[in-house]
Amino acid sequence: MILGTPKADWLAEFPRLADLIALRPSEWFNPAIAPSAEALADVGLGAADVADASARLQRFAPLIARLFPETAASGGIIESDLVEVATFHDALRQHYAAELPGRLWLKRDSHLPISGSIKARGGIYEVLAHAERLALEHGLVGLDDDYSRLAEADCRAFFARHRIAVGSTGNLGLSIGIIGAALGFQASVHMSADARQWKKDKLRAHGVTVVEYASDYSVAVEQGRREAAGDPYTHFVDDENSRDLFLGYAVAAERLRGQLDAAGIRVDSEHPLFVHLPCGVGGGPGGVAFGLKLAFGDAVHCLFAEPTHSPCMFLGVYTGRHEQVSVQDFGIDNRTAADGLAVGRPSGFVGRAMQRLLDGYYTVDDDELFRLLALLERSQGIRLEPSALAGATGIARVTREPQGYRERMGLTSARLANATHLVWATGGGMVPETEMRAYLERGRSLLD
């Protein structure tokens, strides 16, 4: 019984569950998608909130440049490159034996400074927003001051009386632990069994307390939440429900628009933009997709990619039960090499906010992630962690789908030929060489 209903009844009502339960790579193109002008109201946030977040990051830029010299060249703004991957595109055409029209680009959040993943957006933003609230409340800075002052000894001593806590499979904990420690906060990261050892080691090297669990992500989050409850000096970063995290990710879209403009890429109804986003609990891809919909409206098509063993958002939105159901309820084990996506229960906040804004959801098995990892390195010399490749199969999924999605969305052959597909590479820039070699060896063995 699942929520009081026999599994057979679930399968009768939601036939795509059979593929999810059997761990077969599958896709579902959302029949409930609505015009963005209408569906954006579901989110409960708007363009003014994203602009406020962007302005906050600008205020903190001098401090970031001072604390992290690798950001000095960008003036303390944490941003990633956008690169066309035409050789990889050709390799995918051969790999999938399909034409795959359009152009293929990679958004390299894998190589964001400070923590080497998309979590450097939302995670760092939330800690900065919390630090700003404390600093303004206690008179450490004013809104028009130079925030690099917060690196001074008296400010660090003040922050040291406060704690930041978070539950994580790895990358979110890495970004929050590093920025928290850099500001002087005490930081504790509750890490699930899926977290890679090198990420734990890196956090400890920054003076962060790492609490390890033999259980999965949801348990780590709950324990982190429990630690923070009732302690006015502890701020819990709630990956399942945080609006600050969500807004930190959403800022990426306005910057991407500038990068696309600089590259001469048009985005409109005749030149659609498809953005393929790896999804764990949903905050990162949800926030980015929200920002993209604000920036490009119905000309952008956002799709979430998940491991076959951890399809929590697909499951939650498809059934309409969101965080009420977990993959484990259906006998799916939530065990995947894509550690950043090893989440069994989705964010109900993100699922409900974005359920009429996303074009679809698809799953990818671990072996395919490793094949794509090796194929990208072989064709372009770019190295990513397995999680970051989840969206690389998306161009084939959209091109070959049999569900009438393209016709429903008016995606004619001419429009697909003019399309830009963007794979959001979410992490991998800090993977140790020995670990990366093992990833590549596994991928090459599966390809050859």
Swiss-Prot record:
Entry annotated with the keyword Lipid biosynthesis: no
GO MF annotation: an example: pyridoxal phosphate binding
A Pfam match: PALP
Any GO BP: D-serine catabolic process
PANTHER family on file: D-SERINE DEHYDRATASE, THREONINE DEHYDRATASE, MITOCHONDRIAL-RELATED
Annotated protein name in UniProt: Probable D-serine dehydratase
Cofactor: pyridoxal 5'-phosphate
InterPro entries named among the record's database cross-references: D_Ser_am_lyase (IPR011780), Ser/Thr_Dehydratase (IPR050147), Ser/Thr_deHydtase_PyrdxlP-BS (IPR000634), TrpB-like_PALP (IPR001926), TrpB-like_PALP_sf (IPR036052)
Residue positions where N6-(pyridoxal phosphate)lysine is found in the record: 119
Keyword Methyltransferase: no
Catalytic activity, reaction form: D-serine = pyruvate + NH4(+)
Protein EC: 4.3.1.18
Record keywords, A-Z: Lyase, Pyridoxal phosphate
Family annotation (HAMAP family): D_Ser_dehydrat (MF_01030)
Coiled-coil boundaries: none
